[in-house]
Every structure is written in structure tokens, then in C-alpha cells.
């Protein structure tokens, strides 16, 4: 009958929940909640209101159709039999507390109370009409929150005692949860996501009882469902999993602040310039090592997440051998040639200069190791912490270490779990003293704006390489005439100084204002013809090269006097005065004029002297000191300017064929003691 099925569902003893006959609660308020004891201890009344609303229809002791009490009282066993209950209650009945002493199953209604509950019958009839049938599948885990009476009422303040449990026989503290095999409802549905920390649980009691095949509660929980008695209380990581093992597995290894602060934090590291590293890695990255130390390119740069913001960490890079082989570049590729030398002594670690620092500091910004230098100097021991000693033709692997330390930077050597190591295979490189693969060299030139130390050597030795990337002229073009297209500038951001004897400068003279480059100014041939190799080699000295640290002056052309035709000189008529010329020459010059005296006197200058000075300066004046709009040498321009400024020769100012020999030596020497002395003092003044 309808009432029997509803009573059957509600009358089964739930795990840890007890029901009492109504005769013990006659003095209560009655109604649908009359089946609960009115004198129960206050800690046990957790969900009484909820229970009265949810079970009011099913806990009624009167039939809906108004059957007599005798008919209902005569068949309590049939309504409460295990056969009618079904297999769905087998697991739940296994953990039920024993029933009353008379051998009957516990029932919320006493047999003698059935005919005398008129008010309960009316409430049951109304509830049965408004509510649907109850099935066990519709009961969620919150139905189990009813407490059982017992001496453990004093432990309700702790979170571990919120749920009913069966104390072990003869033991003051049993496990918090019993361990029946094959329980219908997993305990994970009632636990918070991470369980409870040990600080709030009694130390003598485990959070989980040992099931079949589980040695302990903690072991069963961390087993991950290894046996029928293993409990997966949440979908996350185990609460007290072993930190080293979890670290090896790449998981969190803990639940943040639930354990020891800082011990459960696992860092996540990202290689910032990974696309650039991959470009080099395709061709096998090479890194130059020198005695003085050479910085890496690409350099190591990381982003770090997942650290404890308040903990302190040391961040450093260690460079170790990637394999036990010795390498060499043969046939356009790297091949092994023996075993590596593992006896190389020297510093192998570079500590970031901002170490130690807090986790929030490391996570706030990009961590760059741009100042790390590589050297092959064995004398660079641990005293020089900025250089890492490597051996040429060996493959190395950089590794990033993050070590949790104290505030003063002291590392706890007894806890290796505080060290986290990260390796990126694309950062492997072979240490070399000179680049072997031209692809790597080209990548360095294209991406490294400060790669000047090898650019001139590489360009002079590889400028014959064919291809669209190189705008280099072929051998013996149009027998060394001046009709070739401009080939000084490539498509990329670099300039090849053509300094080979076979490929002496072949530039055309049509480029008026070439753009500036961060390059060494190429030395151009100042001889009388383009095949004069001896004069070219004599002028290729160190004084004509600019230091790498300054920006070079504009690249200009320089030729002997007889090379230019006369119609080219009218372009000089538009020059400004002396002051504007000196401002154009204001760039720092690392040399002094070798042919220009500081002060000229009238008795020191003669016609032969002037001609000799002018003739020699055409050859010895460095070509890179010309201004941006000049087309000839500096001494020639100064002499022509003096003639232009002379009032006696103003009629010849616009002459199309101005020659330096036309200048009157006497007029020239009159002003040199006053004007030219200060003019040439510019070159000799440091």
C-alpha cells in the first residue's frame, strides 16, 4: 500500500542516525515532528527542522485512507522487511546501529500509537497529496547529517566530529569514519575539497578509517582508489602526499596553506624568448666563449608563477654538460668525436643579482640573465660570479634553480624539497671559440643588435656567398669602372665592409646621404685608381676604425684630386660658414690630424709648403671624418672655404673650376695665424 512504501523508505535506520518511538515524546509538540525525542541533547539537534519538512509525509503513522489501527499494527514486520527494502539498502543497513532490544527493527512509530494520532493522520493526508514518492536515489548526502547520541557530544566543536562515527571497541578514539566495504555513498561527497588540516583534528584519531587493503587512513586517501577500501575524498591532490614524490610527478604536492607555509608551493616557469631560442635550436645553437667572457645570445629570460609571495627564494642558473660527447663541425653539421672532458674546473653557477628576494618580487617581473658571461678561462673561479667556465666544443644545458631560503639568504641543506629545478631543452648550446655554422652566424647578426665583434670578420670572409640575402658584387665586374649599382647596403640592417684585396671598394658615388648604421666604418681606397692595392693596404690601420662603443660617422666617399671631373665642384658653393661646419664636425674623433699643425706663422708657410701640405693631406686624411654633405677631403674644403671668405677673390666665388693651386699663398698665409690656427686646433684638441 502507499503508506507502507513511504514508511519503508523512512523507517530504515540510516548510518549513524537513530529513531525513537513516539511514546517517548508524548510530552512534545506532536505533529509531524513528534517522532523525534523532545528531551534529546541540544548538540544532537542539527537538522530537525529540515527533517520535519522532508520526512513529514513519509514518517506519518496513520494510513491515508483511514484504515483502523489494528490492520496497520498487525503487519509491521511486512512493512519493514529486508525483502521489501530491496538490494539498494544492503550497504546502508550494514552500518546501521542495532535496533531495539525486542528484536524488531527500529521504527519511528510504536504499534500502540497508531490509532491515537488523529492530528498526525490529518497532517499525513495533506502531505501525501502534495509530495511525491520518495526513492533512495533522491536522497543526497546531506540526509546523513543527523547526529547519533553518545558520549562524543563534547567533540562537536572540532570539524572532524561533524559526522557520525563508530568508536572502536575498547579504544577511546577510533577513526572518524567507519570503513565498510562497498559503501553506497563515498565520503568525498560530504568532505570539503581538501579535507581538514591536522591542526584542527584530534591528533589521536585519523580522518579516515582503514578499509580493505588500506594500511592507514592517510595511506588509503593518497592511494588514489587502489582498492575497495580506498577512499577518494576529493578530486584534488592528496592532503598529506609526500612532497618529493609529488614534485617528481609535476603536481602540486600539497594544498597551499593547509600544510607548512611554503612547502606546498610549486613554481611554474615559462621561457620568455622561446621562439627565438627555437630558431637557433633548429641549427644547433652555438655560444662564443672567450678569456674575458662573452654574454649569451639569446640570453636566458623567464617568467615565474606559483611561488609563495611571502617566502624568500634564491634564483640562479647552472650550466651542466648536456651529453658526454665531444663535438666538432664537419660536413656542414655537428658530429661527435670522442668523450667529453668531465674534469673541467671552474664556476658553473650564476646567481641572479637580485637574490634573495620574496616570491612576490620574482613573480612580478621578467627574470633576465642578460649579464651572464661564458668563458674558457680556468682561472675565473668562484671569485668571479658573473662568469661560467666552459670548455670549447662541448654541449651544455642551462638549468634554472629556485631555492627557498631564509630572509638572510641561508639555504637549508637538510631539506632538498625546497629546491625546484627547471630545464628547457631548446636552450642547449655548444660552446665554441668561433662560430662554425653560417646559419647561426646569420641569426646572430639578424637578431642581436650588439653583435659587432664578429660582424666585420664574418662579412669580409663570407661576402662571396651567393644569394639574394647578400648584395655582393661578383668577381671582376665591368673592368673596375664606376658604372656598377650601389652594393654597399643590404636588405637587412647591416653593412658589409668590403676589405678583401680581390673585392676592393666598388661603390658608386650616387648616394648622397646614406643612412647611419651601428657599424664599423669601412675603409675606402683613397688611391688614384681602383687597382692601387698598396695604397689601400697602407691606410688600413687601427686608427681609421671607430671604437665599438660609439656610433660611426656617415659613410662617405674619398678619391684623389684627379679622379673627379670639374663639373662636380659647383656643388660646394652651397656650403655654410665656418661655424656651421664645425658643428657638423662636433662628433667625437678618436684621432688627430697628422698633417695639420696647431698654429701657422707667416715665415713657416711658402708656396712649396702649402702645396706639400695640400697634396699630402689628400692621401692621409681619414675618409670617415667628412661631414654629411661633403664630397671631398677635409683639407681641400678648408682651403676652398678660405678662398671664398677672402674679400679679394669674391669674384671667383662661383667659378665652376676652382682649383686649390689658384689660391694665393701670401693671402692664404695672412689669415692662417689668426683663423687657420683655431680651425686646425679642432683636430688636435682632445
From Swiss-Prot:
Disulfide bonds listed in the record: none
Superkingdom in the source lineage: Eukaryota
Keyword vocabulary terms for this entry: Activator, Adaptive immunity, Chromosomal rearrangement, Developmental protein, Differentiation, DNA-binding, Gastrulation, Immunity, Nucleus, Phosphoprotein, Transcription, Transcription regulation
PROSITE patterns xrefs: TBOX_1, TBOX_2, TBOX_3
Record-listed Phosphoserine modification sites: 107
Coiled coil region boundaries: none
Organ and tissue specificity: Expressed in CD8+ T-cells.
Subcellular location: Nucleus
Induction cue: Up-regulated in CD8+ T-cells simultaneously stimulated with TGFB1 and IL4/interleukin-4.
One GO cellular component, as annotated: nucleoplasm
InterPro entries: p53-like_TF_DNA-bd_sf, T-box_assoc, T-box_DNA-bd, T-box_sf, TF_T-box, TF_T-box_CS
Pfam families assigned: T-box, T-box_assoc
Listed Basic and acidic residues bias regions: 659-673
Biased composition, class Low complexity, residue ranges: 34-43, 646-657
Alphabetical GO biological process terms: adaptive immune response; astrocyte differentiation; brain development; cardioblast differentiation; CD8-positive, alpha-beta T cell differentiation involved in immune response; cell differentiation involved in embryonic placenta development; cerebral cortex neuron differentiation; cerebral cortex regionalization
Disease the record associates with this protein: A translocation t(3;10)(p24;q23) located 215 kb 3' to the EOMES gene but leading to loss of its expression was identified in a large consanguineous family. Homozygous silencing produces microcephaly associated with corpus callosum agenesis, bilateral polymicrogyria, ventricular dilatation and a small cerebellum.
Function statement: Functions as a transcriptional activator playing a crucial role during development. Functions in trophoblast differentiation and later in gastrulation, regulating both mesoderm delamination and endoderm specification. Plays a role in brain development being required for the specification and the proliferation of the intermediate progenitor cells and their progeny in the cerebral cortex. Required for differentiation and migration of unipolar dendritic brush cells. Also involved in the differentiation of CD8+ T-cells during immune response regulating the expression of lytic effector genes.
Name this polypeptide is given: Eomesodermin homolog
Organism in which the protein naturally occurs: Homo sapiens (Human)
Amino acid at each position: 500500500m502507499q503508506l507502507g512504501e513511504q514508511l519503508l523508505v523512512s523507517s530504515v535506520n540510516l548510518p549513524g542516525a537513530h529513531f525513537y518511538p513516539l511514546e517517548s515524546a508524548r510530552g512534545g509538540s506532536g505533529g509531524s515532528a513528534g517522532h523525534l525525542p523532545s528531551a534529546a541533547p541540544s548538540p544532537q539537534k542539527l537538522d530537525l527542522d529540515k527533517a520535519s519538512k522532508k520526512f513529514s509525509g513519509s514518517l506519518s503513522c496513520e494510513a491515508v485512507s483511514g484504515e483502523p489501527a489494528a490492520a496497520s499494527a498487525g503487519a509491521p514486520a511486512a512493512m519493514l522487511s529486508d525483502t521489501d527494502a530491496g538490494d539498494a539498502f544492503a550497504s546502508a543497513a550494514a552500518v546501521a546501529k542495532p535496533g531495539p532490544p525486542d528484536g524488531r527493527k527500529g521504527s519511528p512509530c510504536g504499534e500502540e500509537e497508531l490509532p491515537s494520532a488523529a492530528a498526525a493522520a490529518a497532517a499525513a493526508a495533506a502531505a501525501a497529496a502534495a509530495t511525491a514518492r520518495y526513492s533512495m536515489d533522491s536522497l543526497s548526502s546531506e540526509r546523513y547529517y543527523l547526529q547519533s547520541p553518545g558520549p562524543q557530544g563534547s567533540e562537536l566543536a572540532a570539524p572532524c566530529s561533524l559526522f557520525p562515527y563508530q568508536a572502536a571497541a575498547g579504544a577511546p578514539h577510533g577513526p572518524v569514519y567507519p570503513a565498510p566495504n562497498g559503501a553506497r555513498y563515498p565520503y568525498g561527497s560530504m568532505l570539503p575539497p581538501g579535507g581538514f588540516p591536522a591542526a584542527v583534528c584530534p591528533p589521536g584519531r585519523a580522518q579516515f578509517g582503514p578499509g580493505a587493503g588500506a594500511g592507514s587512513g592517510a595511506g588509503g586517501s593518497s592511494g588514489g582508489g587502489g582498492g575497495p577500501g580506498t577512499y577518494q575524498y576529493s578530486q584534488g591532490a592528496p592532503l598529506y602526499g609526500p612532497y618529493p614524490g609529488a614534485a617528481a610527478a609535476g603536481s602540486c604536492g600539497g594544498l597551499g596553506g593547509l600544510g607548512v607555509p611554503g612547502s606546498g608551493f610549486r613554481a611554474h616557469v615559462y621561457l620568455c624568448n622561446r621562439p627565438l631560442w627555437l630558431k637557433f635550436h633548429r641549427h644547433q645553437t652555438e655560444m662564443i666563449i672567450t678569456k674575458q667572457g662573452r654574454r649569451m645570445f639569446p640570453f636566458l629570460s623567464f617568467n615565474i608563477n606559483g611561488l609563495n609571495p611571502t617566502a624568500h627564494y634564491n634564483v640562479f642558473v647552472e650550466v651542466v654538460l648536456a651529453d658526454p660527447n665531444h663535438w666538432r663541425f664537419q660536413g656542414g653539421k655537428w658530429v661527435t668525436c670522442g668523450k667529453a672532458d668531465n674534469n673541467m674546473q671552474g664556476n658553473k653557477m650564476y646567481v641572479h643579482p637580485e637574490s634573495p628576494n620574496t616570491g612576490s618580487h620574482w613573480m612580478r617581473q621578467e627574470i633576465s640573465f642578460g649579464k651572464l658571461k661564458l668563458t674558457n678561462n680556468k682561472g675565473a673561479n668562484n671569485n668571479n660570479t658573473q662568469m661560467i667556465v666552459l670548455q670549447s666544443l662541448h654541449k651544455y644545458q642551462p638549468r634554472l634553480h629556485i631555492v627557498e631560503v631564509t630572509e638572510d639568504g641561508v639555504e637549508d641543506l637538510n631539506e632538498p624539497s625546497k629546491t625546484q629545478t627547471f630545464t628547457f631543452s631548446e636552450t642547449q648550446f655548444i660552446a665554441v671559440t668561433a662560430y662554425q655554422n653560417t646559419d647561426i652566424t646569420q641569426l646572430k647578426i639578424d637578431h642581436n643588435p650588439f653583435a659587432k665583434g664578429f660582424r666585420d670578420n664574418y662579412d669580409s670572409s663570407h661576402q662571396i656567398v651567393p644569394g639574394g640575402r647578400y648584395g655582393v658584387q661578383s668577381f671582376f665586374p665591368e673592368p673596375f669602372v664606376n658604372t656598377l649599382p650601389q652594393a654597399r647596403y643590404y636588405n637587412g640592417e647591416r653593412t658589409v665592409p668590403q676589405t678583401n684585396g680581390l673585392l676592393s671598394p666598388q661603390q658608386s658615388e650616387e648616394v648622397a646621404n646614406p643612412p647611419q648604421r651601428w657599424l664599423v666604418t669601412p675603409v675606402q681606397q683613397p688611391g688614384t685608381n681602383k687597382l692601387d692595392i698598396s695604397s689601400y693596404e697602407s691606410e688600413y690601420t687601427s686608427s681609421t676604425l671607430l671604437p665599438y662603443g660609439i656610433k660611426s660617422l656617415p659613410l662617405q666617399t674619398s678619391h684623389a684630386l684627379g679622379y673627379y671631373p670639374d663639373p662636380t665642384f659647383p656643388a660646394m658653393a652651397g656650403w655654410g660658414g665656418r661655424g656651421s661646419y664645425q658643428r657638423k664636425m662636433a662628433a667625437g674623433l678618436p684621432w688627430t690630424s697628422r698633417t695639420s699643425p696647431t698654429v701657422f706663422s707667416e715665415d713657416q708657410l711658402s708656396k712649396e709648403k702649402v702645396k706639400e701640405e695640400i697634396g699630402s693631406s689628400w692621401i692621409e686624411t681619414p675618409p670617415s671624418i667628412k661631414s654629411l654633405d661633403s664630397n671631398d677631403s677635409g683639407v681641400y674644403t678648408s682651403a676652398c672655404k678660405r678662398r671664398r671668405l677672402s674679400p679679394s677673390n669674391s669674384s671667383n666665388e662661383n667659378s665652376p673650376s676652382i682649383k686649390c693651386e689658384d689660391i694665393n699663398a701670401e693671402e692664404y698665409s695672412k689669415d692662417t695665424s689668426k683663423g687657420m690656427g683655431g680651425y686646425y686646433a679642432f683636430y688636435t684638441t682632445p
